[in-house]
Amino acid sequence: MKVMCRVILMVAAVALLAISMPVHASKMDDRIESSARKSYVFETYLKTDDIKIQSVNGVVSLTGTVSEESHKSLARETVASLPGVKSVDNRLEVKGDHPAEYSDAWLKMKVKTTLLFHRSVNGLKTEVNDVKDGIVTLQGEATSKAQKDLTTEYAKDVEGVKGVKNEMTVAVAKTSSTVGQNIDDASVTAQVKMMLLYHRSTSALNTSVTTEKGVVTLAGKAKNATEKDLATKLVNDVNGVKSVKNLMTIE
């Protein structure tokens, strides 16, 4: 009789566990989907794209359309950095023609996206109107000569850019920067990863990126101290980054 009672209790316990697991998974999946939609990246860069997010036991599927290849990568990196996500199946499609790698249209997209990641430049007011044979022409407004010069520096360091003509005017700032703005960690991580990939000086780095409460930790390898210091400098200027812990080793 005692043995039978134990068996019944064990069966009941297993049944309760089986019932509770889907409920827990469902809540986690709902949280993943909600966090992705409310993230800085989705509300800022991807707000005009048609992206559907579905999470099943932490396996996330992204479907729909985006306007640029960079948006597809940003969506993947953001979702992959969310707590509870095990993997991302990125089936997003890019609308329209895909510019060939290192073409002028491709460089134009990369320069514009890279400038948007950095808070010390006026990415929203910077117009990348013309790219010809790798030479980028910048127009729009900067809030100071120093900001204009930094915009030139960042654009020159984008992989594939051969030169920059900066025709931006200098005007008094009318919009606030993102300094001190609280941006979710997944969005910070995604921006940092994309920024490091797009900059020529850091594109070859073997770097892992994690973010906790705005503090970014870099790990991996750098060729020398200069390369390591540059990575820290660039990451420090990304939207939402509060500080950087650079744990990269030098080869």
In which residue ranges do the predicted regions lie?
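N-terminal targeting leaders
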Residues: K2-E251
